[in-house]
C-alpha cells in the first residue's frame, strides 16, 4: 500500500526539531522553518521513503531478515506489533551493546530463554519453592524484555530498520561494522551519514512512527507474497512448454 504526501502531512512527518538543535548535514532535506521549528521537505522524503520500501520489498522477496529497532516510548509498542505482523525480529526495550557484533554471546542468552520457556511449559515452576519460582519468573521476564523480540532471529540480520538513528547510534555503529545495510528515519537534529536508506522525517510523533513501521511491514509482506506468486507462475509457465514427443 503506497503512502501519499497528504498522509505524511497528516502524520506530521514534516515537523523537524527546533532550529537551534539542527544538524547542518540535514540541510538538503529541509524546506525552511516555522516558529523556530525546521520543516522537512516532503518532496524529498516521499521518494526516499519509496526507495527504502522498494529495497525492503526486494530483500523480503529473497527471504531476507530485517531487524526493527525502536526503543523510545512513542515507537516501542507499534514497532513490536508491526514487526511481529511481518514475522520479523525486533528490539523494543533497550539495545544491548554487542547485540550484533557479539551475537555469539547473545545466542547463549536466547538459548537460556528458550530453555526456560520449555521448562515453564512443562510445569517446572510448580515444583519450585516460592522464592525459586519468583527468581525464575524475574529472570525470564528480564530476558523476554531484552531479547524476546530476537529469540527466533537465528543469525545476523540482512538489514536493520531504525526509528531515530541518533537515539540508536550504537545499533547503527554495530551494523556499519558488520556491513549490514541500515534503513533509518533521520530527523533534523541528526546526521544522515552512514545510513544506507535515509528517510528524512519526524522521529518523535507516534503518528509518523506508525506510518513508517506500517509501511515497512506492508512492504515485507508484499515482497514475500510477490515471491510466492512468481514461484506459482513459473510452475504454471513450465506446463505450457512441455513438448509432447509423438511416437
UniProtKB/Swiss-Prot annotation:
Q: Which GO terms describe its molecular function?
A: structural constituent of ribosome
Set out the biological process GO terms recorded for this chain's protein: translation
Is Ribosomal protein one of the keywords UniProt gives this record? yes
Name one cellular component (GO) term: cytosolic small ribosomal subunit
The record's keywords, sorted A to Z, are: Ribonucleoprotein, Ribosomal protein
The record's comment on protein family reads:
Belongs to the universal ribosomal protein uS2 family.
Q: Which PANTHER family match?
A: 30S RIBOSOMAL PROTEIN S2 PROKARYOTIC AND ORGANELLAR, SMALL RIBOSOMAL SUBUNIT PROTEIN US2M
The protein's name is Small ribosomal subunit protein uS2
Amino acid at each position: 500500500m503506497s503512502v501519499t504526501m497528504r498522509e505524511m502531512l497528516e502524520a506530521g512527518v514534516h515537523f523537524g526539531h527546533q532550529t537551534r538543535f539542527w544538524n547542518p548535514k540535514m540541510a538538503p532535506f529541509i524546506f525552511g522553518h516555522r516558529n523556530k521549528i525546521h520543516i522537512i521537505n516532503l518532496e524529498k522524503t516521499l521518494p526516499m521513503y519509496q526507495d527504502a520500501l522498494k529495497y525492503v520489498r526486494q530483500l523480503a522477496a529473497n527471504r531476507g531478515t530485517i531487524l526493527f529497532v525502536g526503543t523510545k516510548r512513542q515507537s516501542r509498542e507499534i514497532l513490536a506489533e508491526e514487526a511481529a505482523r511481518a514475522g520479523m525480529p525486533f528490539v523494543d526495550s533497550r539495545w544491548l551493546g554487542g547485540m550484533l557484533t557479539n551475537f555469539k554471546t547473545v545466542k547463549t542468552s536466547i538459548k537460556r530463554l528458550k530453555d526456560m520457556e520449555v521448562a515453564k511449559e512443562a510445569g517446572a515452576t510448580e515444583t519450585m519453592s516460592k522464592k525459586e519460582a519468583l527468581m525464575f519468573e524475574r529472570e525470564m521476564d528480564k530476558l523476554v524484555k531484552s531479547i524476546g523480540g530476537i529469540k527466533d532471529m537465528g543469525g545476523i540480520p540482512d538489514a536493520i530498520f531504525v526509528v531515530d538513528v541518533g537515539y540508536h547510534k550504537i545499533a547503527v555503529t554495530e551494523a556499519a561494522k558488520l556491513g549490514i545495510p541500515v534503513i533509518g528515519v533521520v530527523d533534523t537534529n541528526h546526521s544522515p551519514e552512514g545510513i544506507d536508506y535515509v528517510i528524512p522525517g519526524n522521529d518523535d510523533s507516534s503518528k509518523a512512527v506508525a506510518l513508517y513501521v506500517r509501511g515497512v511491514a506492508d512492504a515485507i509482506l508484499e515482497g514475500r507474497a510477490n515471491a510466492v506468486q512468481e514461484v506459482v507462475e513459473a510452475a504454471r509457465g513450465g506446463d505450457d512448454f512441455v513438448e509432447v514427443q509423438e511416437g
